[in-house]
Each structure stands twice: as structure tokens, then as C-alpha cells.
Amino acid sequence: MTLSLATINVNGLRDKKKRDLVFNWLVAKKIDVICLQETHSTKDDLIRWQNEWKNCGGGNSFFNCGTSDSRGVGILLGKKFKENVEFFSQDNSGRILRSTLKINDSTFYISNIYAPNNGKERKSFFNAINDTLFKYTDDSDKNYSLILSDFNCAIQKNLDRNPPQQLDDISVREFQSMLHRNDLFDVWRKLNPETKRYTFKRGKSKSRIDYILCSNAVSSKVFGTRINHFPFSDHDIIITKLKTEDINRGPGMWIMNLETIKSEQFRHAFKIWWDNWKIEKNKYSDIREWWDLAKNKIQLLTMEISRN
């Protein structure tokens, strides 16, 4: 089957007329799973909004509330989408909402994320979700991550901002680390490696800060990704499609084997490697780059010894 997904920062849905327009517009697009950011929903709104979505022709929906003037995320399902989608988890600030989608023997963890505007807060946020977001309920090799988000961060200062910036966005290093550690890829950029296209406009400034991220194991199954104008917000909508049949096993999330690192073989190999690696430190202008690479090498060393 083909799964269609979309992400859009709606810039507030408290106005009833706007909410009706947005819901009807999204229903007309016949998208299976839609992730909304910045809904400005409160707990008092939930039942009414869920009923309104169904009355407009939608299916089930989940919301994680912020306040009446900030944050809030939601996941809307198309009426004809009959697959097994269940609420999974949420944070306490209206920034994260996760659900699970089970298709055959595969489980897709769909995460809707709205990152902070403030750079320092965003760095802490990325570090926090790096440690918690990618933990699954079982150790199956058929767990896959789908992240639909407004990360408030442009990955490439020259391609993803107009006018181009001299410096990287605050938190871009943490963002890239999250992608690498969790084997994720930026769907739109992978299919459009050199294209300048933006998802957010304010005044003369444009940026691509909204993303759909997927596990690399499903990279060959993603197609039809596009950024379309959304008439009810200062953000554009990203839509993609995913062929869910015959997905090959991916590398999954690596977990260090504690028995391996206790072994004499590992301690001996690690000491030799570490003594040499410390000498390389002076070749790096940024010690964080040296340390990030060190962690990758430790992972590879551990995996190699585990296989022996």
C-alpha cells in the first residue's frame, strides 16, 4: 500500500472560520496522516476539534495541547485510512506527539515535533529528544521512524536560507547529530540535493525549517515529496508518499552490548585505539567534531568485536 503524509505549521487554529477552512482544505487533499504544529489548542478544545475534523470529512485525530496562544501539536487521519494507528506518547509542553502505525509486521513510529524558537532552548530540546524519542517498545528489527516537524532550524545556511547566512543556525550541530545517531534522512533534501525551496517566509526572509524525516531503511520507498503553498499560514505544507510493502530490514537502532565492553579483548583493543586517537585531537579545530567522530569509531569497534 501507499501511505501519504504531510506536515504543516498552521500558525494557530483558535478562530473557528480558519479552522473550518483548514480542515476542509486538508480533507480535499486526501492525505492519510497529517501532522499539525502550533495549533494553540487547549484541553477544553479537544472533543470539539475532533468532532469538527470528522464533520469536515476526516477520520480520527490526536492532540497534545499547548496554550491558547502558543505551541500545541496534532495528528489528523484521513477518513478512508483504516490502518491501525494508535496514540503512543506525548510530552508535557505541547511540542511532541507520537503515534504508532502497524502495517503487516512493521511498526512505524510517527512523531510530530514542534521545536522551540529560542536557540538555546532548541539545543537542549534536541539533546533531550536524542536520548528519549527513539526508544521503541520492543526490539523488533522492523521498527521505523517517521518524523514530521517544524524544527525552527535550517540545516544548510546557504541552501536553506534566503538570504544565505554567514553562520550556521544555533542548534544545527545537535540537529545533525540526531539525524546521524538515529539513522534518519531528510526526505525532501535527499530527493532535491541542490534545490533552493523554502517552507517559511517572513518579510524578505525565507527558510526551510519544516521537515519530514524517515529511517534510512525506507529511503528507497519514499517518492512524490513536494512543498506546496498553504494559504492559511506563513508556512508551506510538505507532502510525501511511502510505499510500505516489501520494506527491507534496516540497520535499526544500535545498542551497546555490555558483555562486549567488559571483555578483555575489548579493553585491550580500546586502549590501543584510544591512545592513538588522542594524538589526533590536535588536528581538529573543534573538539566537539573530534569527540563526535570518536563516538562513531567506538560504536564500530564494539560492533566488530561483538561479531568475533
In which residue ranges do the predicted regions lie?
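Short phosphate/oxyanion-binding micro-motifs
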Residues: 1-142, 166, 262
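Mobile genetic element proteins and their domesticated derivatives, centered on retroelements
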Residues: 9, 26, 31-38, 76, ...
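Catalytic metal-binding/acid-base residues of hydrolase active sites
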Residues: 11, 39-40, 114-116, 151-154, ...
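Conserved residues at the C-terminal ends of beta-strands
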Residues: 37, 42, 190, 215, ...
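Acidic carboxylate-rich catalytic motifs and surrounding loops in phosphoryl-/glycosyl-chemistry enzymes
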Residues: 38, 88-91, 152, 182-204, ...
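Active site of divalent-metal-dependent phosphoester/diester hydrolases
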Residues: 59-77, 168-214, 275-291, 295
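Surface polyanion/phosphate-binding segment centered on an Asp-His-Pro turn
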Residues: 100-108, 138-141, 145-146, 170, ...
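Catalytic palm subdomain of template-directed nucleic-acid polymerases
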Residues: 153-170
